[in-house]
Amino acid sequence: METETIKAGDSKDIVKSRYDACAEQGGGEGAVCCAGDTPASPSFAAEHGLYSREELSLVPKIAFTLSRGCGNPAGFADLQPGEVVVDFGCGAGIDVVLAAHKVGPAGKVVGVDMTPHMIERAKQSVAEAHVAETTEFLLADLEQVELPDGFADVVISNCVINLCPDKEAVYREAFRVLKPGGRLAISDIVYGGETDPQVRERFQANWAGCVGGAIEEDRYFQILQDVG
């Protein structure tokens, strides 16, 4: 019970502090949010084709350097010109940039993040990518996003919701801001089966790491069913 209390009370502050420092320092050595060649590191993304060469050519260096994603939600969301997209946990803006190119000048992309320096980096990214006019950013907790009901055609998120202690609340917000018939495109970390308790405890102790807040795949899908 004590461990759960620590997670609920402190995990947001831990994540915010870690990722804000990472963004402030530019993502260089000693400022890595997810350590090593994990599925959420830039080197992994390049070597394993999470993003195509064409996509990477559209992305400013700072956005990719600070990317800690585990997938490419803007790539599989089937984004169409003119659509409105919200990125939950946009970080330095790699997926905001890619989504903005897909929805074009008639569309709009809103990036949401709780870390001030990541928001600043994201603004830098969209300016360098020449998509600032169709993008905007909100500094907000994903459990309380200041956007109206039925705002977006698509909500995307990349390796972020696993870090949120109250995943149900985050998904309630995602479904709230979606239009009727809207779409979710989520890349995230889950446990695929039985996990050694000691291994899991080690991951949970480092909540800001890539696997810290992960839950079982079955439970993850149950949350989606319950709130959506």
Question: How would you label these PLM feature ranges?
Answer:
Residues 1-48:
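N-terminal auxiliary segments of SAM/dcSAM-dependent transferases
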Residues 162-163, 210:
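A short His-aromatic
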Residues 168-183:
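A short glycine-rich, Lys/Arg-flanked "PGG" loop and its adjoining helix->strand segment in the class I
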Residues 186-188:
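Acidic carboxylate diad motif detector
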Residues 212-228:
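Short alpha-helix
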